[in-house]
Amino acid sequence: MKKLVFLMFAFIIANSGQAQVDKEFYNKYSDAKGVQTTYISPSMFKQMDQEALNIQCDNISLKSVHGMYVIDCDDPATIKRIKKDIDLKLSQNEFELMIESKDGDDCSRIYMAKKGNDTIGLVVFSEDSEDINIVFIDGSTNED
């Protein structure tokens, strides 16, 4: 329950999916053992209340959402591969740890990277002893 609340909180404060890099990551693991995936397109976000999508976080105002990729996994071998890949991706793309919450085996983190003048990338990462959840979110700070 804590993990779900954390993920929903992260979605509310960020509401954004990290374009090409995250699509590749999503595609790599979408058919892996024990993995469940969800993709939310920019068109779906356009159906949402635009005022609700005008999110402000850390002096950054998110004006549009480009999509969101969600990866959930409960297979131990696949989790190990995902964790290795996500650690590499976060270290290579200048992500800053924004929030971290630990409770026993449960650990949740939100990372943010500003890309160029107007794009924001967020990664919401949550794991416990049985599964791992990753949400990639991208958005623009300027109107499209």
Model-predicted regions and their roles:
Residues 1-25:
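Bacterial Sec-dependent N-terminal signal peptides
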Residues 4, 43, 73-76, 115, ...:
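Generic structural motif
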Residues 22-81, 85:
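Early exported N-terminus immediately downstream of N-terminal targeting peptides
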Residues 32-35, 63-65, 92, 103-107, ...:
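Extracytoplasmic
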